[in-house]
Structures are given as C-alpha cells and as structure tokens.
Amino acid sequence: IHAALRNENILALVVNNCVFGMTGGQMSPATLIGQKTTSSPAGRDLAYNGAPFDVTKALKDFDIAYLARGSVDSPGEVMKVKQYIRKALEKQQRGEGFCLVEVLSPCPTNWGLSPVDSLTFMREKQKAFFQVGEFVDKNAEGGM
C-alpha cells in the first residue's frame, strides 16, 4: 500500500484464489462472504470477519500508473490477463510508476470442488464480487 501511495516503480502481481492455499486453505482477506475454509468451516461471516478485501477498490484513487484485474476461467480471459501483465511491464520499463495486476484463480483442492465446478464458482461467485477489467491506466490514449 505504501509503495502505491508513493507511486514507486514497482509491479505487484497478485494471485487471488480467495484462500491461503499453500498452507491448508485457511480464510484469506479475499475469502468471500459465506465461503467455507479450514479456518471458517461455517463460512466467512460479515459481522464477525468483516468484508472481503478488494485491492482494486483500495488503490483506484491513488496516483498510480496501472491497476487491473483479470481471470483465468477461460482462454479469452487468460489472453486479457496476458495483455494486462504486458501493459504493466511496459509501464515499468518506461518508469511510469506503481502497477498492480490481480489475477483471479481457482483453488479446486482447498475449495473442495472439481476443476470444472471451480470454474463455475469463479464465474458465478468470485467474478461477481471481484469485477474484472482495467481500473487505472495513467498516460493511456483517451485516458481512463
């Protein structure tokens, strides 16, 4: 957050699968309301755990170079993510400032879903809460 506030020439790539998947599937700041994890077996409770953290909403009003979120739930979405990452890297090469690209990703193992059902969860739940697209593109033609 502080690097973004200072508009440091840093690229942050964030993979959001709504859980801490490498440590057993515990609730993360991005776990959705009602989503079950090993540390929240009844599901995330808004009153007790608070709302999921949306990094794009937190950073969208900062004076940064680029902010985008994509998804890997289809080949077309993967292509968009690649474009977002390329654009962020190009901005880094030009020294334009802080860039963040968040990638929505499935976690079939810790979600307890099949790979196909994980894609359905992504489309119906994850992408409904975490909107995809480009949110800040400083110095873009036509502005943003």
Where are these predicted regions, by residue range?
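Thiamine diphosphate
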Residues: 1-21, 83-87
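A glycine- and small-aliphatic-rich helix-loop capping segment at beta-alpha/alpha-beta transitions
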Residues: 1-10, 28-35, 117-121
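Structural motif
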Residues: 9-13, 19, 57, 65-68, ...
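Short, ordered loop/turn segments at secondary-structure junctions
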Residues: 15-18, 72, 104-106
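Short glycine-enriched loops at secondary-structure junctions
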Residues: 16-19, 26, 52
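Short acidic, glycine/serine/threonine-rich loops at helix termini
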Residues: 22-28, 111-116
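Conserved thiamine diphosphate
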Residues: 29-94
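Flexible, low-complexity linker and terminal segments
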Residues: 93-144
